Regions:
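Short, small-residue-biased leader/transition segments that mark boundaries at the very start
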Residues: 1-5
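Conserved catalytic alpha/beta cores of large enzymes that bind or transform nucleotide phosphates
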Residues: 6-42, 125
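Short, surface-exposed linear segments at secondary-structure transitions and domain or protein termini
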Residues: 9-17, 59-63, 104-112, 177-182, ...
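Beta-propeller and closely related beta-pinwheel folds
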Residues: 10-24, 56-82, 119, 184-190
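Repeat-based blade/solenoid architectures
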Residues: 14-22, 83, 111-112, 118-128, ...
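A short acidic-Thr-Gly-centered motif at the start of a beta-strand
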Residues: 25-33, 78-80, 147-151
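A structural feature that tracks compact, well-ordered secondary-structure segments
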Residues: 37-55, 66, 77-80, 85-106, ...
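Intrinsic, low-complexity N-terminal interaction/targeting segments
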Residues: 124-149, 171-201, 250-257
Length: 257
């Protein structure tokens, strides 16, 4: 299905150089805040984790969440717990997955964070994702029972490019490594595909919304998108016209509808 967006309105008093990077729900019970952390990711590859309690009280004009370099910006903010993994994806198709618990909790909000991924020249992070970890390993090997358990809770990492191509790949193919490395190929960044605009975890039964720079929005069922390995280009998901480009893609959250 498809629709166009023509009107917009302000929900926050933003300055001309500011824009919203993330919107997310908070736990309803404030006593639950201590059980969660909040992780920030910047375009230049920095990450920082704070206790969610650090942001329990925010006034109407907002508060400074993270100190940034002049050429940097926040591209993703997620709530996470120690039993989860972090995935950073870049516009050139690279990605890295590391354990959330191995990222230390920062005190205060004045730090620039630490390196999440080593970026190639002119590359930048476009997506921050959080997924449950696969803690079933024993002595570094996976038994048949381990593999069955992981397969039962399998998710897919969906990647979408600016030229309307994309694919989904099993999260099992994204190995856990140490933070700060160069990462692995998540999707091939080819002239046909263009740069990657979005990458995030989905289940087979989910649906996504894809938006273009011409104000067009299309709704797609994840099951209609081909499953492929990491080192592939994917297939056409949305047909674009002229100078039209995909600018974002998000998973539809049924709990918010």
């Amino acid at each position: 299905s498809e629709m166009c967006i023509r009107d917009r309105f302000n929900i926050l008093p933003l300055k001309s150089h500011q824009s919203i990077s993330s919107i997310m729900p908070m736990p309803e019970n404030e006593t639950d805040l201590k059980n969660y952390q909040i992780i920030f990711a910047t375009a230049q590859g920095k990450v920082r984790k704070n206790s969610l309690e650090d942001f329990s009280s925010i006034n109407a004009s907002g508060k400074i969440a993270m100190k940034l370099d002049n050429n940097d910006k926040i591209v993703g903010v997620k709530i996470c717990q120690d039993a989860q993994d972090i995935i950073l994806s870049t516009k050139f198709g690279k990605c890295i997955r590391f354990e959330a618990k191995k990222l230390r909790v920062f005190k205060g909000r004045s730090s620039k964070g630490i390196k999440g991924i080593e970026l190639a020249p002119n590359d930048q992070i476009v997506s921050l994702s959080v997924i449950d970890n696969d803690k079933t390993k024993k002595n570094g090997k996976k038994s048949k029972d381990d593999k069955s358990e992981i397969k039962a809770k399998e998710k897919f990492v969906l990647s979408i490019s600016e030229n309307g191509y994309g694919k989904k790949t099993s999260h099992i193919d994204y190995r856990v490594t140490n933070r700060g490395g160069k990462g692995i190929i998540g999707i091939v960044n080819s002239p046909r595909n263009g740069n990657i605009t979005s990458s995030f975890p989905v289940f087979e039964g989910d649906e996504i919304l894809i938006s273009t720079n011409k104000g067009r929005v299309i709704r797609v069922a994840v099951k209609e998108i081909r499953t492929a390995g990491r080192n592939t280009q994917g297939v056409r998901i949305i047909k674009l016209s002229g100078e039209e480009k995909v600018v974002s893609a998000i998973k539809i959250d049924d709990n918010l509808l």
